[in-house]
A protein has these predicted regions:
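A polyanion-binding, active-site-adjacent surface
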Residues: 2-219
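Intrinsic-disorder-associated, low-complexity terminal segments enriched in Asp/Asn/His/Tyr and depleted
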Residues: 227-230
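Ala/Thr-enriched low-complexity intrinsically disordered regions
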Residues: 233-235
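Catalytic cores of phosphodiester-bond-cleaving enzymes
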Residues: 238
Length: 238
């Protein structure tokens, strides 16, 4: 790691420590307080070039402290075409949800939406401190709304999740420096959605897997010094 990258990571580590110590959803909540002790979960680094921007941890992740340690994670890794070792290599893949803590469940046992405190307090600071990403995978409506607007792509946000995901080719090609994907949550609750929208697995996933592989390969070549191109100005081929 270069001296500049070390300083960048050191500053990021301080911000992540602040986030992991956050208790705003108990001490200064926007609405009902969190029904349990906070446990913010995120994995970021100054070198990762793929961002998994998800919704919020579930019950298993709240206990493990590691994102996607559940059936949803198994399905997501299958979608991406990566194994657990690659997925959890924080030097290559960052994982940052819209809500860092498990938000609790409703009366029917479904997970509540991400807490609003996280985005308001932390997200702008966090993504300003992180490098530009090759790929941003926005999972679920809250992540899509935040990141598409942050990237100046708010006009591509559909009236609902299906419309946004169905516009994936337009969303993907909207920037030269970063490819953005809008994805449904990989929860079993969306199995019916996947059956109703077979184009997702037939058309979108092969392109997503190819982009994941290309980004990982480019990062590997840069790391080994075989690619001398400036990462700050790197663009995707048309």
């Amino acid at each position: 790691m270069s001296d500049g990258a070390f300083v960048e990571q050191e500053g990021l580590d301080g911000l992540v420590a602040e986030i992991r110590a956050c208790r705003a959803c108990l001490d200064a909540p926007l609405g009902p307080p969190l029904p349990h002790e906070p446990r913010p979960v995120l994995r970021v680094s100054s070198t990762a070039r793929i961002l998994v921007a998800s919704q919020a941890p579930g019950t298993k992740v709240h206990l493990s402290g590691l994102p996607f340690t559940d059936a949803s994670g198994d399905r997501l890794r299958k979608w991406l075409g990566v194994d657990k070792k690659t997925f959890y290599d924080v030097s290559r893949i960052a994982i940052a949800a819209m809500g860092f803590c498990f938000p609790g469940q409703d009366a029917k046992g479904a997970d509540l939406p991400p807490r609003r405190e996280c985005a308001r307090l932390w997200h702008d600071r966090l993504f300003a401190a992180l490098p530009e990403f090759d790929l941003i995978l926005t999972i679920g409506r809250p992540a899509q709304a935040y990141h598409l607007k942050r990237l100046g792509l708010g006009h591509l946000l559909g009236t609902g999740l299906t419309q946004t995901v169905a516009s994936w080719r337009q969303v993907r090609a909207s920037r030269n420096d970063t490819r953005v994907y809008a994805l449904p949550h990989p929860s079993w609750r969306n199995t019916g959605w996947l059956k109703k929208n077979p184009w997702f697995e037939a058309d979108l996933l092969p392109e997503l897997q190819a982009d994941i592989a290309a980004s990982l390969d480019r990062a590997e070549r840069v790391c080994k010094g075989r690619d001398k191109s400036d990462r700050e100005t790197a663009t995707w081929p048309k």
